[in-house]
Regions:
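Non-catalytic connector elements of ABC transporters
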Residues: 6-124
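Conserved beta-strand-loop-alpha-helix hinge in the C-terminal portion
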Residues: 1-4
Length: 124
């Protein structure tokens, strides 16, 4: 990736906001209808457990949760890399977690992303 390892969600600006499965992201200075990419680094994603098909409640700072199922988990020495197949578009979403975290393949988990750790850029 251009910046570093990152998850990219494509969106479009409407009313100064870019909508995504994780909720809306402020897009100041971008014109209405601009195609954008929401950039989310793997280390900034938070993981929460599934509660009978439900995730954590949405919050202003974390947006709404999006569900994915584990497709691979590896311990990399000082962190774990967990890859999810996301329910919203079947894409692969990468998350890094400090220490050992190795959920079973197929396990559904919920992901949230803190708004202050994500970036919205015009798509080229």
């Amino acid at each position: 990736a251009f910046f570093s390892d990152a998850n990219i969600i494509k969106s479009k600006v409407k009313g100064a906001l870019a909508d995504s499965p994780f909720g809306q992201f402020f897009s100041p200075g971008l014109a209405e209808g601009t195609n954008v990419e929401i950039v989310i680094r793997p280390q900034h994603v938070r993981i929460d457990f599934d509660r009978d098909g439900k995730g954590p409640l949405p919050t202003v700072s974390m947006g709404r949760p999006a569900r994915g199922c584990v497709v691979r988990a590896r311990f990399l020495g000082n962190e774990s890399l967990v890859e999810f197949r996301m329910d919203f578009d079947n894409s692969i979403f990468k998350v890094t977690v400090p220490n050992v975290f190795l959920p079973k393949v197929g396990q559904p988990l919920w992901l949230t992303v803190p708004r202050d750790r994500c970036f919205v850029f015009p798509a080229y």
